[in-house]
Amino acid sequence: MELKQSLSVHLEAEKPLRRYGAVEETAWKAEGLGSQLDIISMAETSMMPEEIELEMAKIQRLREVLVRRESELRFMMDDIQLCKDIMDLKQELQNLVAIPEKEKTKLQKQREDELIQKIHRLVQKRDFLVDDAEVERLREQEEDKEMADFLRIKLKPLDKVTKTSASSRAEKKAEPPPSKPTVAKTGLALIKDCCGTTQCNIM
């Protein structure tokens, strides 16, 4: 029984941590509860909070663009259908109008009045649709202005941070590196250097 428990604890300790994309499961050991635990953030250490917020704003902007495009396509489909219905009714009305008034039957006169009323209602409906599209366009312009102001405010501190980090890197490059023997890096070391402090271009 003790052997099984010892084996179970050993296997549990060697069990690899799960990964969810760039997020690694936090290591949790029962025997270390009394000591200080190293908590690793779920976010990539190469991104600052301002950069994360800016990236989220860009994603939100992309989502809004897709929603707008869907709305535009719906407006277009409704407008095409309304125009088609109006043209069909007008064609039928023209055929009735071409008949001399004295030769028209009572049903034909009633149908002519019905067509005029239907065409009038459809024209009004299309006018409402055009007005709604114009209101939507003005609202989108206001949203674009607000988003542009937001991005401009958020990009200013990031530009300062980028310039500061670039100048610090330039100062570091100016210092001569200490001489040390050349050692060939393994694949794991190359990956670590590639994805350490800056975002990997390959990823």
UniProtKB/Swiss-Prot annotation:
A Pfam family assignment: bMERB_dom
GO biological process: cell motility involved in cerebral cortex radial glia guided migration; microtubule depolymerization; negative regulation of cell motility involved in cerebral cortex radial glia guided migration; negative regulation of microtubule depolymerization
Gene that encodes it: Bmerb1
GO annotation, cellular component aspect: microtubule cytoskeleton
Span of domain bMERB: 3-149
Protein name: bMERB domain-containing protein 1
Chain residue ranges for the region called Disordered: 161-184
Domain of life assignment: Eukaryota
Lineage, broadest ranks: Eukaryota, Metazoa, Chordata, Craniata, Vertebrata
InterPro entries according to UniProt: bMERB_dom (IPR022735), C16orf45-like (IPR040127)
PANTHER family to which the protein is assigned, alphabetical: BMERB DOMAIN-CONTAINING PROTEIN 1 (PTHR22704:SF1), BMERB DOMAIN-CONTAINING PROTEIN 1-RELATED (PTHR22704)
